[in-house]
């Protein structure tokens, strides 16, 4: 379950959800947010900025913990949704750009702190209210390519790939939401094919 602040985290915990089942998101996490995530033992912290990597590394060393983290990657894809809720184009505030090399640099920085941070995998989110699979298909292919780059440069095969949510719902009567199982199967096939082509284990 995703939470995006210390407040949302507190609500989730109050509702009886175990910290290990939570992912801490947010592109502007405060020190309080990160400290709350560490204290709750959240399953994963999704990193969105270089400053956040440094902050979390400091807190992890101070507290003697080694949280599992994901790098949020901006993949530069067209999500075919309203521009206000598209989150994977280059000119936006979330994550590290694949095209500029920021994603690769973020991975290097986290791996340099591997005594404090456990890099578990990569995360992407291309937008909300998405009704066609093409954006997800491009995103899946690109992020699997980055997994292969990590293996080739660092000798590490990251175990987790999170392609995010954002599937459209019937918000107005004219909307025709996609079939979730069908879209999941399309993505599974793309990831499996890309992994096979690049020699990555699934």
Predicted regions, residues:
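Active-site-proximal loop/turn and secondary-structure-junction residues that shape catalytic pockets
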Residues: 7-8, 28-30, 49-51, 73-77, ...
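N-terminal active-site wall of soluble small-molecule enzyme domains
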Residues: 1-42
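Structured alpha-helical segments in the cores of large, soluble enzyme domains
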Residues: 8, 12, 25, 74-75, ...
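Active-site-proximal beta-alpha loop/turn segments in soluble metabolic enzymes
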Residues: 38, 76-95, 121-136, 162-179
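Conserved anion-binding
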Residues: 49-116
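Hydrophobic or amphipathic alpha-helical targeting/insertion segments
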Residues: 33, 38-47, 55-56, 64
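Conserved, mostly hydrophobic/aromatic
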Residues: 5, 37, 56, 71, ...
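C-terminal active-site-proximal or functional interface alpha/beta core segments in diverse enzymes
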Residues: 128-202
């Amino acid at each position: 379950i995703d939470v995006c602040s210390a407040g949302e985290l507190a609500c989730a915990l109050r509702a009886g959800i175990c910290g290990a089942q939570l992912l801490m998101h947010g592109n502007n996490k405060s020190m309080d947010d990160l400290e709350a995530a560490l204290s709750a033992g959240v399953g994963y912290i999704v990193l969105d900025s270089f400053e956040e990597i440094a902050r979390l590394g400091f807190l992890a060393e101070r507290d003697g913990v080694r949280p599992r983290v994901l790098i949020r990657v901006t993949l530069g894809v067209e999500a075919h949704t309203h521009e206000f809720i598209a989150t994977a184009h280059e000119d936006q505030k979330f994550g590290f750009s694949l095209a500029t090399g920021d994603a690769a640099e973020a991975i290097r920085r986290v791996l340099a702190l591997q005594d404090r941070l456990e890099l578990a995998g990569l995360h992407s989110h291309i937008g909300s209210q998405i009704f066609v699979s093409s954006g997800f298909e491009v995103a899946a292919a690109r992020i699997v390519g980055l997994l292969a780059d990590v293996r080739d440069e660092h000798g590490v095969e990251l175990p987790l790939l999170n392609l995010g949510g954002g599937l459209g719902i019937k918000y107005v009567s004219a909307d025709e939401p996609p079939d979730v199982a069908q879209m999941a199967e399309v993505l599974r096939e793309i990831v499996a094919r890309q992994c096979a082509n690049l020699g990555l284990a699934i």
